């Protein structure tokens, strides 16, 4: 027979022991220190709190309030305070007419006087009348006034929603940004007409920039990348691909479509051209130059597979048609203008007279074109010999004089000192002008302690 063990009784806690043994004075020291917070840990916290302050966060106080903000339950958000903007009365904007002044004064006019609320003015009564009498006559006081007096009390309240009509206050407006809008409520009939603003007539080509700083230069448009590995390359030889590509695809219900835009088709089973089988879209065409030719290209999308969800899957095909090749520029070989068979014997002076040499003195003699003889000079070549006639009278004849070839013009001795005309143009150097202006600064210019006079002529020198 198995004996049942007695249940283990729970030991009393330190709080229960302290409540029973404190009065009798039999409590252990560790129980008293734990309950009365006199352990070493409690003493360290008490001593450290004398030098630290956490600003009312509730740390170490044991209050359990969680500081000023309190505790926030887990899984919730703190409450937010929504700022409600007070409603403001709408601002009445009055239109400005052509008769209104263009200058707006920001100082209040002195003629505008605030009169306040109107109230009636009452004049005071004559008061009481005192009747004096003799000693025998008793004093009679007339307490009834001659006219009925009325006591009127006036109280003024400020109501922001009501403005007295005789008082018009011009609002003061202060603006720093440069845009001033002054609105003043007015009453009465306006004497002007509201005319809508219109755009001024401007002249231009229509290509003017719309921004203040246009982008310099032109942006290059990216060419279509048609030769990637993701595209299947198919060459088309049928010319109908240029203007009527729909004839290469079997369409159930063909309709008119522009060939320069993207063409869409319904998938069909059989196509006239096997390269266009299962084509559902042909994108807009593009002309490119590649490998020395003009190429017409279109991108096509096929619908080879169809999933249960209705999505179509297919390859992308690049159809191209070579329109015409670009011919290379022909290189024309330059031909020599003269034959290279003839060779010269050497340097030959065509102006020399080989028949007889003239003396040196006769070369510098004065002669006219009529006096010059016309000689025939033979040219010697290895292949053949021919005579060439060269006239010697086509050049200018310049006479030669002894001394410097400078001729000064002569003029009358009286004013004005003007040179005579016509001038003698037979000389090499002719000085035009008869007056001279000498600059005083250059009379005596010091240079290396030498006095050298400089004289400049105010005239023109013509050669």
Swiss-Prot record:
The gene is L2. Pfam families: Late_protein_L2 (PF00513). Interacts with major capsid protein L1. Interacts with E2; this interaction inhibits E2 transcriptional activity but not the DNA replication function E2. Interacts with host GADD45GIP1. Interacts with host HSPA8; this interaction is required for L2 nuclear translocation. Interacts with host importins KPNB2 and KPNB3. Forms a complex with importin alpha2-beta1 heterodimers via interaction with the importin alpha2 adapter. Interacts with host DYNLT1; this interaction is essential for virus intracellular transport during entry. Highly phosphorylated. The lineage of its organism: Viruses, Monodnaviria, Shotokuvirae, Cossaviricota, Papovaviricetes. The keyword Transferase does not apply. This is Minor capsid protein L2. GO terms for cellular component: host cell; host cell endosome; host cell Golgi apparatus; host cell nucleus; viral capsid. Minor protein of the capsid that localizes along the inner surface of the virion, within the central cavities beneath the L1 pentamers. Plays a role in capsid stabilization through interaction with the major capsid protein L1. Once the virion enters the host cell, L2 escorts the genomic DNA into the nucleus by promoting escape from the endosomal compartments and traffic through the host Golgi network. Keywords: Capsid protein, Cytoplasmic inwards viral transport, Disulfide bond, DNA-binding, Host endosome, Host Golgi apparatus, Host nucleus, Host-virus interaction, Late protein, Microtubular inwards viral transport, Phosphoprotein, Viral penetration into host nucleus, Virion, Virus entry into host cell. It comes from Human papillomavirus type 53. One of its GO terms (molecular function) is structural molecule activity. A motif (Nuclear localization signal) lies at residues 1-12, 444-452. Disulfide bonds join 21-27. It is found in: Virion; Host nucleus; Host early endosome; Host Golgi apparatus.
């Amino acid at each position: 027979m198995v004996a049942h063990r007695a249940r283990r009784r729970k030991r009393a806690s330190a709080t229960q022991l302290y409540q029973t043994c404190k009065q009798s004075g039999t409590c252990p020291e560790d129980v008293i220190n734990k309950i009365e917070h006199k352990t070493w840990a409690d003493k360290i916290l008490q001593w450290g709190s004398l030098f630290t302050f956490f600003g009312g966060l509730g740390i170490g106080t044991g209050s359990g309030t969680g500081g000023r903000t309190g505790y926030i339950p887990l899984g919730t958000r703190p409450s937010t305070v929504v700022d409600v903007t007070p409603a403001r009365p709408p601002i009445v904007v009055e239109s400005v007419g052509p008769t209104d002044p263009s200058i707006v004064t920001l100082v209040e006019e002195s003629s505008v006087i605030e009169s306040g609320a109107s109230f009636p003015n009452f004049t005071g009564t004559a008061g009481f009348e005192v009747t004096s009498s003799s000693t025998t006559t008793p004093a009679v006081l007339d307490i009834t006034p001659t006219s009925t007096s009325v006591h009127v009390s006036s109280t003024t309240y400020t109501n922001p929603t009501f403005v007295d009509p005789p008082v018009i206050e011009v609002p003061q407006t202060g603006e720093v940004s440069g845009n001033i809008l002054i609105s003043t409520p007015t009453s009465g009939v306006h004497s002007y007409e509201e005319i809508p603003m219109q755009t001024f007539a401007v002249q231009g080509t229509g290509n003017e920039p719309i921004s203040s700083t246009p982008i310099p230069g032109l942006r290059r448009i990216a060419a279509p990348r048609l030769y990637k590995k993701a595209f299947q390359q198919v060459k088309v030889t049928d010319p109908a691909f240029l203007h009527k590509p729909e004839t290469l695809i079997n369409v159930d219900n063909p309709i008119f479509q522009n060939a320069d835009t993207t063409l869409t088709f319904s998938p069909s089973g059989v196509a006239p051209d096997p390269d266009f089988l299962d084509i559902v879209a042909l994108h807009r065409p593009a002309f490119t130059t590649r490998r020395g030719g003009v190429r017409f290209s279109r991108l096509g999308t096929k619908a080879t597979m169809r999933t249960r969800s209705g999505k179509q899957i297919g390859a992308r095909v690049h159809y191209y048609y070579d329109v015409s090749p670009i011919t290379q520029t022909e290189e024309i070989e330059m031909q020599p203008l003269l034959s290279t068979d003839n060779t010269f014997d050497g340097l030959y002076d065509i102006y020399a007279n080989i028949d007889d040499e003239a003396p040196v003195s006769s070369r510098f003699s004065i002669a006219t074109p009529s006096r010059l003889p016309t000689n025939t000079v033979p040219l010697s070549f290895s292949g053949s010999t021919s005579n060439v006639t060269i006239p010697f009278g086509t050049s200018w004849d310049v006479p030669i004089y002894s001394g410097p070839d400078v001729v000064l013009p002569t003029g009358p001795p009286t004013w004005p000192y003007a040179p005579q005309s016509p001038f003698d143009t037979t000389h090499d150097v002719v000085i035009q002008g008869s007056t001279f202006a000498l600059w005083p600064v250059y009379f005596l210019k010091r240079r290396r302690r030498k006095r050298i006079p400089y004289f400049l002529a105010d005239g023109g020198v013509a050669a």
